[in-house]
């Protein structure tokens, strides 16, 4: 795949670690210059040109992000030291130095220099000697800054084959009935970024992700979020368990919000039925920063909310008057975990801890004997009985899931890292359950799952069929995927969480054999680098 441009443009592109690997044809201070070949005619070229225009637009908006991030970060710690009565002269000098840079000139080296000054000054001016305590303080100061920003809805649009699609992302702070947030604890329009590891009331980084067609009709919706674990609290503590329970209740409330007709019925006093399929993307091993204990927190909290026979689950939700009202839900939750990073797919780690969990959940979703004899039961069979038109799609996805699991294909990349998690999420939506998916932060692996879902939903909407298993993306599908990666709202969510856009899934490793297949799935190094963005800064 080759990105082209009408005429011949030379455009400035951010250099440094964030965009390493871009094709350089000339250099200025701090930037690289990239040339694009001329293309004149053909339907195929229209798609390429549309992608190129989007690329150039994103490039323009991204160019100054590194400088803005550095300035914001310096100012945050300047104010923190000033508030504590410390000497701000060195931070101020760094701010003045940053003011001399032009857009596009700040790279990772400059951020490292800034972070070194911040660390030295916070230690000296606030009198912190312990290294771990210092790191915690620095992280908390910037987390508080990010959490004090307004988080609003993100709405993006793309065109494909003459059809328009809308991507609507609604943060938890805007999950409202009228002007009132539905949750027990108010968000007050703010966000809870992924670094909020001790947060006990809210899930970090929770969004309703919806896809609509050109008539505004929903063709997919689900909840994406950070892990249901206050993993900054002491492991196995009652405080941490209570926090997980609060987060799980908030997720169920968000799932109910995603189904307005059910929410309305529940608030009117009716007991409603709600099914949730939770698909986690963690790698639960001791090598992944505690993801094993995080998954345990999440699974225990969600399972603990399952309704017992004859005893609906009770939730508190704010109505349009802002009053808390108890609602009754016949709640059924199944929980999966499919690792999607290099440790899981290239080194085979983390599966031993989740195979049993996944097998149990498959029985609930597709029936006790499905993996053995292919007879669909469980929630899927119930859905077919209630809604016969979904039968073909359910069977198609179920058979792919069966093949993946029986052949253990989910434990390898094989050109499609999210093959099982994506199909499980699509099956959940197809049978009328609310799909929820998460990683640790809710921005990188979760964002890639979001993009993979959107690509597949658009394909299904246009062709009437889901992709075949083990099929490679065509050049046209790569262009669609690239468009979604650049214009689906994921970059905005990453920036809200860290201060800069960029997906950490995009990695270049010393051994290329350990890398995931996203270079191939995207098909263009410049777009790959743009999606990676400034993730190395954070």
UniProtKB/Swiss-Prot annotation:
It comes from the Bacteria. Its EC number is 3.1.3.78. A motif (CX5R motif) lies at residues 439-445. InterPro entries: IpgD/SopB (IPR008108). The keyword Signal does not apply. Contains the consensus sequence Cys-X(5)-Arg characteristic of Mg-independent phosphatases. This is Inositol phosphate phosphatase IpgD. It comes from Shigella sonnei. The gene is ipgD.
């Amino acid at each position: 795949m080759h990105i082209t441009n009408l005429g011949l443009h030379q455009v400035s592109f951010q250099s440094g670690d964030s965009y390493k690997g871009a094709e350089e044809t000339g250099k200025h201070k701090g930037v690289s210059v990239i040339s694009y070949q001329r293309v004149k005619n053909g339907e195929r070229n229209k798609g390429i040109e549309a992608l190129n225009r989007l690329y150039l637009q994103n490039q323009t908006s991204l160019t100054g992000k590194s400088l803005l991030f550095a300035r914001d970060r310096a100012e945050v710690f300047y104010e923190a030291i000033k508030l504590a009565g410390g000497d701000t002269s060195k931070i101020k000098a760094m701010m003045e130095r940053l003011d001399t840079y032009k857009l596009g000139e700040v790279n990772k080296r400059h951020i490292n220099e800034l972070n070194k000054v911040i660390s030295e000054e916070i230690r000296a001016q606030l009198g912190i000697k312990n290294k771990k305590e210092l790191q915690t303080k620095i992280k908390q100061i910037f987390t508080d800054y990010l959490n004090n920003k307004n988080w609003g809805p993100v709405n993006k649009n793309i065109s494909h084959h003459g059809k328009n699609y809308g991507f609507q992302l609604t943060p938890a702070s805007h999950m409202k009935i009228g002007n009132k947030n539905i949750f027990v604890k108010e968000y007050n329009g703010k966000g809870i970024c992924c670094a909020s590891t001790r947060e006990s009331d809210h899930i970090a980084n929770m969004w309703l992700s919806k896809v609509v067609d050109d008539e505004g009709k929903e063709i997919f919706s689900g909840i994406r979020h950070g892990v249901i674990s206050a993993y900054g609290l002491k492991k196995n503590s009652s405080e941490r368990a209570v926090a997980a329970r609060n987060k799980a209740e908030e997720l169920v409330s968000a799932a109910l919000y995603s189904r307005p007709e059910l929410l309305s019925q529940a608030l009117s006093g009716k007991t409603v039925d709600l099914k949730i399929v939770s698909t986690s993307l963690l790698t639960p091993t001791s090598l992944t920063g505690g993801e094993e204990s995080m998954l345990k927190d999440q699974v225990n909290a969600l399972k603990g909310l399952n309704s017992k026979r004859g005893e609906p689950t009770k939730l508190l939700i704010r109505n349009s008057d802002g009053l808390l009202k108890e609602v009754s839900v016949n709640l059924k939750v199944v929980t999966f975990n499919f690792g999607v990073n290099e440790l899981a797919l290239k080194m085979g780690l983390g599966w031993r801890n989740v195979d049993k969990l996944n097998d149990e959940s498959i029985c609930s979703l597709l029936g006790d004997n499905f993996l053995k004899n292919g007879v669909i039961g469980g929630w899927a069979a119930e859905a077919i009985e209630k809604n016969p038109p979904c039968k073909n799609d359910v069977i198609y996805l179920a058979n792919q899931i069966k093949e993946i699991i029986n052949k253990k294909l989910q434990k390898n990349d094989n050109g499609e890292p999210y093959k099982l998690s994506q199909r499980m999420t699509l099956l959940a939506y197809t049978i009328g359950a609310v799909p929820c998916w998460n990683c640790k932060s809710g921005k990188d692996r979760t964002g890639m799952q979001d993009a993979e879902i959107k690509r597949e939903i658009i394909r299904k909407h246009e062709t009437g069929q889901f992709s075949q298993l083990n099929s490679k993306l065509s050049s046209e599908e790569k262009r669609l995927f690239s468009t979604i990666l650049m214009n689906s709202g994921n970059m905005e969510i990453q920036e809200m969480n860290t201060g800069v856009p960029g997906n950490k899934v995009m990695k270049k490793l010393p051994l290329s054999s350990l890398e995931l297949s996203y270079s191939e799935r995207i098909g263009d190094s410049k777009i790959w680098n743009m999606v990676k963005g400034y993730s190395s800064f954070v």
